[in-house]
Amino acid sequence: MTFPSDTFTTGQVLTAAQMNGIGDDINNLWRLTFRAVTGTSDTLVLADSYNKLITYSNTGTTTITIPNSSSVAFTTGAIVNILKTGATGTISIIQGSGVTISSAGATATNPVITATAGAASIIKTGGDSFTVVGRIA
């Protein structure tokens, strides 16, 4: 994400072009990009935590691994959004080495998504701790 390179001063009257540039940058803060996963395994990367929706469509079980902070330096409060798009299959979210997951799922440390259009957010709550919320089993 980049913002206008112009430097503005107090009391300056901005041109329409300058205002439009600022508006475009602000709009881009809310625009999601997509990453589609069709395979059976995925390890989250830093870029996944910024305005991204990861879609999973495999008909079998897809395993998502949350890596520890020495591998991927997610900031506290980082959110990774995931969506199951396939009609069949399951998404299983697992802990990388040293990672702790909590959720309201049947197995709190290994939440799964089974429903079509089931979505969840993985939130880093500190250190190597993550909470998974959403439509999980």
Predicted regions, residues:
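Short, intrinsically disordered N-terminal pre-domain segments
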Residues: M1-N20, V133-A137
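Short clusters of hydrophobic/aromatic residues that line enzyme substrate/ligand-binding pockets
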Residues: F3, F8, I64-I66, I113
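Short capping/connector residues at structural and topological boundaries
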Residues: F8, V13, S49-Y50, S71, ...
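Exposed extracellular interaction/assembly regions and N-terminal maturation sites
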Residues: Q18-S97, K124-A137
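Terminal beta-strand-rich extracellular "head" domains
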Residues: G96-T116
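Extracellular disulfide-bonded cysteine-rich modules/repeats
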Residues: A115-T125
